[in-house]
Amino acid sequence: MNLAAYYPVLLFLLVGTGLGIALVSIGKILGPNKPDSEKNAPYECGFEAFEDARMKFDVRYYLVAILFIIFDLETAFLFPWGVALREIGWPGFIAMMIFLLEFLLGFAYIWKKGGLDWE
């Protein structure tokens, strides 16, 4: 395996990381930093904070977010498949039908377990 082809990528990563660290460091060193009690006070729309900013969220929010990401990712696989359907032929069609069957089985399982019910 010829690793010389990856040297530009490595150089790009090193320069990008170094430049990012350098710019953040320069901003921290040269930027004005004069904290006082007013600047460190909690602020919420011109008023003192009414309650703790760290409210607990219901676990269902996270469940809905995870389910959305999973199903959105599965749906994203449909677009390249639709574009390349003529080139991949029957094997690609059968593979995608198996994928969609697994997708529908997962959707039915989540629906049956109540993952889509809010109450």
Curated annotation (Swiss-Prot):
It holds the Pfam family Oxidored_q4. Keywords: Cell inner membrane, Cell membrane, Membrane, NAD, Quinone, Translocase, Transmembrane, Transmembrane helix, Transport, Ubiquinone. Its EC number is 7.1.1.-. It is found in: Cell inner membrane. GO terms for molecular function: NADH dehydrogenase (ubiquinone) activity; NADH:ubiquinone reductase (non-electrogenic) activity; quinone binding. The chain crosses the membrane at residues 7-27, 63-83, 88-108. GO terms for cellular component: NADH dehydrogenase complex; plasma membrane. InterPro entries: NAD(P)H_OxRDtase_bac/plastid, NADH_UbQ/plastoQ_OxRdtase_su3, NDAH_ubi_oxred_su3_sf. It catalyses: a quinone + NADH + 5 H(+)(in) = a quinol + NAD(+) + 4 H(+)(out). NDH-1 is composed of 14 different subunits. Subunits NuoA, H, J, K, L, M, N constitute the membrane sector of the complex. Belongs to the complex I subunit 3 family. NDH-1 shuttles electrons from NADH, via FMN and iron-sulfur (Fe-S) centers, to quinones in the respiratory chain. The immediate electron acceptor for the enzyme in this species is believed to be ubiquinone. Couples the redox reaction to proton translocation (for every two electrons transferred, four hydrogen ions are translocated across the cytoplasmic membrane), and thus conserves the redox energy in a proton gradient. This is NADH-quinone oxidoreductase subunit A. The lineage of its organism: Bacteria, Pseudomonadati, Pseudomonadota, Betaproteobacteria, Burkholderiales.
